[in-house]
């Protein structure tokens, strides 16, 4: 079985990226990360990627960036794009070009709590469980088909920081 060539998009700390890197190193995940792309030049996840010998690319997303992004993507023959804490909505043109190859790691049990501030929303709603979803990316925000979910019981003293971890 050949290994998937993947690119991971991040914006921040890169804790999910580190989990992916660790699971690749243990051969649990049969893939290779060929690059990590971030819209934040100061993202700690870029340090994690560099420490693992993974190429890093910073793309300024303040203006129209789809052309720059497509040039970068065309340089790689990728099988999978993983959005791992990437805090920008991808342009429709990009989603169409890579449809079926883009997955997102979202910190809620979709279809509940789409978008931002999921941990706060879960606590405010007094949910019994919280978790994460991996889903295919479509033009609908956090609305693509769900691939897998993991859940955990919310304990009495849990707060946003605990749920994030």
Task: Set out the residue ranges of the language-model regions.
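N-terminal Rossmann-like dinucleotide-binding module
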Residues: 1-44
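Donor/substrate-binding cores of folate-linked one-carbon enzymes
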Residues: 23, 84-165
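Short, surface-exposed acidic-centric catalytic microdomains
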Residues: 29-68
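Residue-level detector of anion-binding/catalytic polar loops
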Residues: 55, 79, 128
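Conserved acidic residues
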Residues: 34, 79, 100
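N-terminal glycine-rich "phosphate-gripper" loop used for MgATP/nucleotide binding
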Residues: 38, 61-62, 76-92
């Amino acid at each position: 079985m050949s290994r998937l060539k993947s690119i991971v998009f991040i914006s921040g700390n890169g804790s999910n990226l580190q989990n992916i890197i660790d699971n690749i190193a243990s051969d649990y995940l049969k893939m290779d990360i060929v690059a990590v792309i971030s819209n934040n030049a100061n993202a700690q996840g870029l340090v994690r990627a560099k420490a693992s010998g993974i190429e890093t690319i910073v793309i300024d997303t303040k203006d129209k960036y789809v052309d720059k992004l497509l040039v970068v993507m065309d340089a790689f023959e990728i099988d999978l794009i993983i959005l791992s804490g990437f805090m920008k909505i991808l342009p429709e043109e990009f989603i169409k070009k890579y449809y079926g190859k883009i997955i997102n790691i979202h910190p809620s049990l979709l279809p509940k709590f789409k978008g931002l501030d999921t941990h706060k929303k879960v606590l405010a709603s007094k949910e019994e469980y919280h978790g994460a979803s991996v889903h295919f990316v479509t033009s609908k925000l956090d609305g693509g088909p769900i691939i897998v979910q993991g859940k955990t019981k919310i304990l009495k003293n849990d707060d946003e920081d605990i749920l994030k971890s």
